[in-house]
Design a protein with these regions (language model features):
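Early extracytoplasmic/lumenal segment of secretory-pathway proteins
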Residues: 23-90, 219
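Short, low-complexity disordered leader/linker segments with a strong preference
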Residues: 1-29
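Short beta-strand and adjacent tight-turn residues that come in two discontinuous sequence segments
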Residues: 59, 82, 167, 212, ...
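A ligand-binding cleft/hinge motif common to bilobed small-molecule-binding domains
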Residues: 86-89, 228-246
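Mature extracytoplasmic/periplasmic domains
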Residues: 263, 268-325
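Periplasmic-binding protein-like
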Residues: 194-204, 245-269
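Extracellular/periplasmic bilobal clamshell ligand-binding domains
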Residues: 310-348
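Extracytoplasmic ligand-binding site segments that recognize negatively charged/polar headgroups
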Residues: 76-77, 82-208, 215-222
Length: 348
């Protein structure tokens, strides 16, 4: 009896030891990314397949992310998802490490059209595209009939929208829109071109704009307070009931283009789980997984060439309207030119 009990205790101790060892060996991937940007079901599927734990910490801006990483947070995370203008800065500061191309087997699924728009790291040595998008224009068709207005950034000069129009509180976006309307690069540093953009905003657009806002414009549009707004489609569509989308919202990006953003997955130089981070990039770009991300936000398929066939929901807008958009680049010290223009606009 004692022998049996002793054997049982030894077996129990062995099981406990193996369980503890298993827990100790379970890897943890620490992902620092945008708020609500990673589908929970995809994360859980990754955890199950790779026997790991994913800890997601969220940020609301590139500036927040960068400041945290630059001020002692680099060792706290494995991966980040910065905009490409910040990728440029992080590469200069030696914050990122190269991606193991042998593990990133889904590289061939990244759209060449998208790669051509990359202004930084087109070879994808340090960054894997996650999402490409742009702000656009939303018109409330209940207030102004569709087809009865200019489908251009200069729609903000239309006095019918006076007191019911808003633009984002973002100087690269607003000034970039004016530059695109004039036919210039959204990242120009030419003083003459910037002066022309400033004049358009001051003289033509500003008289009709009730506020600059990057947070509540979706709610204001849904309430009917705004008839015209510049912003991200998901912020408006997310506030208007889906059954009212077609009759209420006309979202478009003008043919003259405008500023766009490209956010990419990157591995930090201090990462403790480099291979696992690379596997996560590869996992996200399995077409069926990437389609879940797109469906979750009703985004169009622009980055991954095969994901569209797995999508189950109609996107808010067609991917083709992004073709004319230009990715913003880091302007370094020349950013002050934009900031000074913006100060003058905001004062008025």
């Amino acid at each position: 009896m004692k022998l049996k009990m002793k054997t049982t205790l030894i077996f129990a101790a062995l099981v406990a030891s193996l369980t503890l060892l298993s827990c100790e060996q379970k890897r943890t991937l620490k992902l620092y990314t945008w708020t609500y940007y990673t589908p929970e079901n995809v994360v859980k599927a990754f955890e199950k397949e790779f026997n790991c734990k994913v800890v997601v910490t969220e940020y609301d801006s590139n500036e927040t992310m960068y400041n945290k990483i630059a001020n002692g947070g680099a060792k706290s995370f494995d991966m980040v998802v910065p905009g490409q203008d910040y990728i440029s800065i992080m590469l200069q500061k030696d914050m990122l490490q190269p991606i193991n191309q042998e593990l990133f087997t889904n590289r061939n699924l990244i759209s060449q059209k998208l790669i051509d728009k990359k202004s930084v790291d087109r070879e994808m040595i340090y960054s894997v595209p996650y999402y490409f998008g742009a702000s656009g224009i939303c018109v409330n068709k209940k207030k102004v009939p569709a087809g009865d207005y200019e489908r251009s950034w200069n729609i903000f000069a239309d006095s019918r929208f006076k007191g019911h129009a808003s633009m984002m509180d973002d100087y690269r976006e607003v000034i970039g829109d004016a530059l695109a309307y004039k036919g210039y690069s959204v990242s120009t540093i030419d003083d003459k071109e910037l002066a022309e953009a400033e004049a358009i905003i001051h003289n033509e657009w500003l008289p009709n704009i009730v506020k600059f806002d990057a947070e509540s414009f979706g709610k204001d549009f849904a309430r009917g307070d705004l008839w015209l707004c510049q912003g991200y489609a998901e912020c408006v569509y997310g506030e208007v009931p889906e059954e009212e989308w077609d009759e209420t919202i006309d979202f478009f990006i003008p043919e003259e283009g405008g500023p766009s953003y490209l956010e990419c997955m990157c591995i930090l130089k201090e990462s403790k789980n480099v291979d696992l981070a690379t596997e996560f990039m590869n996992f996200m770009h399995r077409p069926e997984n990437y389609a879940q991300f797109l469906d979750g936000f009703r985004f169009p398929c622009y980055v991954n060439t095969e994901a569209e066939k797995y999508m189950t929901k109609k996107p808010m807008y067609p991917a083709s309207i992004l073709d004319h958009c230009e990715a913003k680049v880091d302007l370094g010290e020349n950013l002050d030119k934009y900031y000074k223009i913006w100060e003058g606009i905001r004062i008025k």
